[in-house]
Protein backbone atom coordinates (compact mmCIF):
# COMPACT_ATOMS: atom_id res chain seq x y z
CA UNK A 1 0.00 0.00 0.00
CA UNK A 2 1.21 3.48 -0.82
CA UNK A 3 0.58 5.23 2.50
CA UNK A 4 1.69 8.60 1.15
CA UNK A 5 -0.82 8.61 -1.70
CA UNK A 6 -3.64 7.32 0.50
CA UNK A 7 -2.80 10.02 3.07
CA UNK A 8 -3.00 12.61 0.29
CA UNK A 9 -6.45 11.30 -0.59
CA UNK A 10 -7.58 11.75 3.03
CA UNK A 11 -5.99 15.20 3.12
CA UNK A 12 -7.83 16.23 -0.05
CA UNK A 13 -11.11 15.09 1.51
CA UNK A 14 -10.24 17.12 4.65
CA UNK A 15 -9.98 14.03 6.88
CA UNK A 16 -6.83 15.30 8.54
CA UNK A 17 -6.73 12.78 11.40
CA UNK A 18 -6.69 9.81 9.02
CA UNK A 19 -4.19 11.60 6.80
CA UNK A 20 -1.86 12.14 9.78
CA UNK A 21 -1.95 8.45 10.69
CA UNK A 22 -0.99 7.41 7.16
CA UNK A 23 1.65 10.10 6.71
CA UNK A 24 3.25 8.83 9.92
CA UNK A 25 3.39 5.32 8.43
CA UNK A 26 4.95 6.79 5.31
CA UNK A 27 7.55 8.58 7.46
CA UNK A 28 8.37 5.32 9.26
CA UNK A 29 8.96 3.64 5.90
CA UNK A 30 10.99 6.67 4.73
CA UNK A 31 8.69 7.02 1.71
CA UNK A 32 8.67 10.62 0.49
CA UNK A 33 10.00 11.45 3.94
CA UNK A 34 10.37 15.24 3.67
CA UNK A 35 6.99 15.59 1.96
CA UNK A 36 5.36 13.23 4.47
CA UNK A 37 6.74 15.25 7.39
CA UNK A 38 5.62 18.49 5.76
CA UNK A 39 2.17 17.20 4.89
CA UNK A 40 1.68 15.88 8.43
CA UNK A 41 2.60 19.34 9.71
CA UNK A 42 0.09 20.96 7.35
CA UNK A 43 -2.62 18.63 8.68
CA UNK A 44 -1.79 19.80 12.20
CA UNK A 45 -1.92 23.41 10.98
CA UNK A 46 -5.37 22.77 9.47
CA UNK A 47 -6.41 21.40 12.89
CA UNK A 48 -4.91 24.55 14.52
CA UNK A 49 -2.39 22.40 16.39
CA UNK A 50 0.65 24.57 15.72
CA UNK A 51 2.84 23.15 18.49
CA UNK A 52 2.75 19.68 16.93
CA UNK A 53 3.40 21.10 13.46
CA UNK A 54 6.63 22.89 14.39
CA UNK A 55 8.91 19.88 15.07
CA UNK A 56 7.66 18.20 11.90
CA UNK A 57 8.46 21.28 9.84
CA UNK A 58 11.89 21.50 11.46
CA UNK A 59 12.59 17.84 10.61
CA UNK A 60 11.41 18.32 7.04
CA UNK A 61 13.81 21.27 6.70
CA UNK A 62 16.71 19.03 7.69
CA UNK A 63 15.88 16.90 4.66
CA UNK A 64 14.93 19.61 2.18
CA UNK A 65 15.20 23.40 2.18
CA UNK A 66 11.90 24.53 0.73
CA UNK A 67 10.27 27.95 0.80
CA UNK A 68 6.87 26.56 1.83
CA UNK A 69 8.43 24.69 4.76
CA UNK A 70 9.98 27.91 6.08
CA UNK A 71 6.81 29.89 5.35
CA UNK A 72 4.57 27.49 7.25
CA UNK A 73 7.03 27.38 10.14
CA UNK A 74 6.82 31.16 10.26
CA UNK A 75 3.03 30.93 10.18
CA UNK A 76 3.02 28.52 13.14
CA UNK A 77 5.20 30.88 15.15
CA UNK A 78 2.90 33.82 14.33
CA UNK A 79 -0.07 31.81 15.54
CA UNK A 80 1.81 31.09 18.78
CA UNK A 81 2.72 34.80 19.19
CA UNK A 82 6.43 34.26 18.62
CA UNK A 83 7.04 37.07 16.15
CA UNK A 84 10.82 36.86 16.39
CA UNK A 85 10.99 33.24 15.20
CA UNK A 86 8.23 33.92 12.68
CA UNK A 87 10.21 36.78 11.19
CA UNK A 88 13.37 34.66 10.93
CA UNK A 89 11.51 31.95 9.03
CA UNK A 90 9.64 34.33 6.75
CA UNK A 91 12.91 36.11 5.90
CA UNK A 92 14.60 32.77 5.19
CA UNK A 93 11.73 31.82 2.89
CA UNK A 94 11.99 35.19 1.18
CA UNK A 95 15.72 34.74 0.52
CA UNK A 96 14.83 31.53 -1.33
CA UNK A 97 12.33 33.44 -3.47
CA UNK A 98 12.49 37.25 -3.27
CA UNK A 99 9.49 37.45 -5.63
CA UNK A 100 7.17 35.74 -3.12
CA UNK A 101 4.51 38.32 -2.26
CA UNK A 102 3.15 36.36 0.72
CA UNK A 103 6.59 36.34 2.37
CA UNK A 104 7.04 40.03 1.75
CA UNK A 105 3.60 40.79 3.18
CA UNK A 106 4.21 38.66 6.30
CA UNK A 107 7.57 40.32 6.90
CA UNK A 108 6.05 43.80 6.49
CA UNK A 109 3.23 43.02 8.92
CA UNK A 110 5.63 41.82 11.61
CA UNK A 111 8.09 44.68 11.10
CA UNK A 112 5.26 47.23 11.22
CA UNK A 113 4.03 45.68 14.46
CA UNK A 114 7.54 46.00 15.93
CA UNK A 115 7.66 49.66 14.88
CA UNK A 116 4.28 50.38 16.51
CA UNK A 117 5.26 48.54 19.70
CA UNK A 118 8.46 50.57 19.98
CA UNK A 119 6.81 53.99 19.63
Please annotate each region the language model reported.
Residues 1, 34-35, 67-68, 101-102:
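Helix-start (N-cap) detector for alpha-helical repeat units in TPR-like alpha-solenoids
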Residues 31, 64-65, 98:
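Short coil turns that delineate tetratricopeptide repeat
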Residues 25-26, 59-60, 92-93:
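Canonical positions in the second alpha-helix
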Amino acid sequence: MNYFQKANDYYNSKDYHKAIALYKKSITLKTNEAASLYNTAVCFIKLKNYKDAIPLLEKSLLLKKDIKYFFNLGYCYIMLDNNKKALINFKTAWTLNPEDKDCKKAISLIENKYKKDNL
